[in-house]
């Protein structure tokens, strides 16, 4: 289910505070965050977030097409290493 419109988007208060401070100063420094659940709002456009994926912080540059999605969608938590080829010749 999606979130109710009357509630509005969820953004962690500390993250919104950092974005507001940078918008006032006119700077666009990287904002390190562990808040993967925060929704991207229009005032995040042009900022770069370092979103934690459980191991490291992945840089995510926010564009217009990302508005309405969550930060965690752009920092995958699992790395796919590929399927191992099961071949008799490879074992020799």
Swiss-Prot record:
GO terms for molecular function: rRNA binding; structural constituent of ribosome. One of its GO terms (biological process) is ribosomal small subunit assembly. Keywords: Ribonucleoprotein, Ribosomal protein, RNA-binding, rRNA-binding. Protein S19 forms a complex with S13 that binds strongly to the 16S ribosomal RNA. It holds the Pfam family Ribosomal_S19. Transmembrane segments: none annotated. It comes from the Bacteria. One of its GO terms (cellular component) is small ribosomal subunit. HAMAP family: Ribosomal_uS19. Belongs to the universal ribosomal protein uS19 family. InterPro entries: Ribosomal_uS19, Ribosomal_uS19_bac-type, Ribosomal_uS19_CS, Ribosomal_uS19_SF. This is Small ribosomal subunit protein uS19. The keyword RNA-binding applies.
């Amino acid at each position: 289910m999606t979130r109710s419109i009357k509630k509005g988007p969820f953004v962690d208060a500390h993250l919104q505070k950092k974005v507001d401070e940078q918008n006032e100063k006119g700077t666009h420094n990287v904002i390190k965050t562990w808040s993967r659940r925060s929704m991207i709002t229009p005032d995040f456009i042009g900022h770069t977030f370092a979103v934690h994926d459980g191991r490291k912080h992945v840089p995510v540059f926010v564009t217009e097409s990302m508005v309405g999605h969550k930060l965690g969608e752009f920092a995958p938590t699992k790395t796919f290493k590929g399927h191992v080829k099961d071949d008799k010749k490879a074992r020799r």
